[in-house]
Amino acid sequence: MKLTLNRDSMFHLANRLRAEHGPSYVIDQLYGKACAVNKNSIIESIRTTGEIASLRGKGRFYLFAVDADPRLRYERIQLRKSETDAVSFDLFLENEKRESVSADPGVPNLRACIGAADFLFVNNGSKTELYQQVDVILSTLDFPVQ
């Protein structure tokens, strides 16, 4: 059976994988791939508290959250023209609401993930402004930037 490539199908597939294999299954697979490269790595789209707990247990891990005004985030996803982002603003907001809060560590809870971040970047400006925020934080961390 072929899945339709959209945010909804990806949401349900990831939730099913976490339900079947544990709340950190998806992120643990990505972590394994990152370790195989043997360099500093960035894993994006951490969405559950179970994923955060797993990564925190592995050692040198920093959680960066990037947030922006919902309208601006919507405009940006429309510009990238991804198949998974072809939604109305109302559906975008519904998806955000669905992924914002959950007591289940294997289900997206973006508000808790943002709250658990070591560093929060507000991305309401330009890329240059975001990069400047990130550079300031990276310069304070105890590992070489590659």
Predicted regions and their residues:
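Small-molecule kinase domains that catalyze NTP-dependent phosphoryl transfer to phosphate-bearing small molecules
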Residues: S24, R80-Q133, I137-T140
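ATP-dependent small-molecule kinase phosphotransfer cores
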Residues: M1-I42, I46-A53, D90-L93
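Short, hydrophobic alpha-helical segments
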Residues: A34, N38, I137-V145
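ATP-dependent NMP and nucleoside kinases share a basic, alpha-helical "lid"
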Residues: G32-E83
